[in-house]
Amino acid sequence: MTVSLFQIMEVCDSRSPAKILSNYMYTGRQVDGAIGSLEVLPEIVDAVGGKMTILFDSGVRTGADIIKALCLGADAVLVGRPVIYGLAIDGKNGAEAVMKGLLADLWQTMSLSGICTVAECTRDKIRKVVYPGDGKAML
């Protein structure tokens, strides 16, 4: 499978079979107030309409993070830094421990949310809530 890795801020070139949506690629993590990948994910998913695989990679740290991305339309979620931290601390065992913990958190969050399978992670299971005052949105 070919994967194109580039900045996605708006719907753009859709010739490759997969796109990785990451805030690292467009300063979402470095510039305070920049749009986050999770906020733009539904727009990108709507635009490509199932024509390509969307891989989400942006600050995934918990099972809830995974569910949010899947509910908003990502086909898969990539986890990098936490696994690297585990690897640095205890090699392969550390990386595996991080992944096991993340998967346990995912299944617990799914259970508490009434979601039985990953296939049930759909947009009707999530909503955007805007809190008055600071103008920031929470997903």
Give, region by region, the residue ranges found by the protein language model.
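Glycine/Thr-rich beta-alpha phosphate-binding loop at enzyme active sites
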Residues: M1-I44, G86-I89
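Alpha/beta catalytic cores of nucleotide-metabolism and tRNA/nucleoside-modifying enzymes
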Residues: E39-D57, R61-L139
